[in-house]
Amino acid sequence: MKRIIYAILALAAMAACAGPQVGVITEPVSASTNIQGREYPKINPDLSVEFRVNAPEAEAVAVDICSKVYPMTKNEEGVWVVTTDPQEPGFHYYFLVIDGVRLSDPSSQLFFGCSVMASAIDIPEAGCDFYLPKKKVDRGEVRMQRYWSDIEQNWRVCYVYVPAEYESKPDKRYPVLYLQHGGGEDETGWVRQGKTDVIMDNLLAKRKAEPMLVVMEFGQSGGDFGKILLNETIPMIDSRYRTVADNRHRAMAGLSMGGGQSWSIGLKHPEVFSNIGIFSSGMFGGVSYAPFDLAKEAPELLADPQAFNDNLDVFYISCGETDPRITHTQAAVEAMRAAGAEIHFSAFPGGHEWQPWRKSLHEFVQMLFK
């Protein structure tokens, strides 16, 4: 039965990028990630990008997009110019390199990624509008929640998405998704880069997802993060918000490092979480980690597949089609399925970056709390 539900919801989710040709560029447009009023960078109809940098005294200037470097040429006005190759749709970090020094672009908004505040450009994808704001959709809120951690002996901040109906239905209680960022990012990532609130608002407007809270927490706390999440974050959220405080109404998901945490914390605590999403995790292989060992990582599955499946309402794994992790992830999924696990697996166009993660979230939340 679970497999049938997975298949139906997956087909519905695929429709998100199969509609009218929204996102098609017919003339150069300023990037949505530019600081307001800045003309450049500009995205061209072929998805190449024109960058301009005013640095008349510099000796050499280049743009570094995800480690691909584009040397720039200085024009007569002292402005450095380059047009890149066509870019893949989605969100990409970039840096300027001026006389060998890597800097952020003063024309771009800044986003925390690569463990620094980085410039970025968001390339539209033709036909994909599930993460774009729409005028006639009720808007939820993203609330900054500050709280004290006895474990860290420090103040922490998490962000909480609250659906638009929350204040108008004071007697209603809500399930909760705990959504984790990747390495080199922080609790702002799923809001600013991932567009979680927009994705949720659009799905709720179409009645394709259940109203829920989404908690986005800082996960780079070393070995203490699991303790903080289980013993401090979740009790704090349950005390301050109207939640349904049981495992069937609680989910955990994350990208890359956050996907590994969803396994090591979420999957290992079925009394807390009955819904797990793992997006592009390196724990299955494809990066520098040791090969995935099913007997070591999931002995409970091998011991009792039926109990393993009964503990989970949704077990979801995804990866980008050109992510180095894809082959190893698919092999791990097949090994777990052979052992009896019921898993939904999806692969999306793209590498280890935000467009596949946005699509993963969009698909995953439609499966939750049904």
Where are these regions (language model features)?
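Positively charged n-region of N-terminal signal peptides that target proteins for export
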Residues: 1-4
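General helical structural elements
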Residues: 6-7, 56
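Non-catalytic cap/lid and distal C-terminal segments of serine-dependent acyl enzymes
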Residues: 25-32, 43-70, 74-370
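Bacterial N-terminal signal peptides
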Residues: 7-15
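Bacterial signal peptide processing site
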Residues: 18-19
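Short beta-strand segments of immunoglobulin-like
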Residues: 38-42
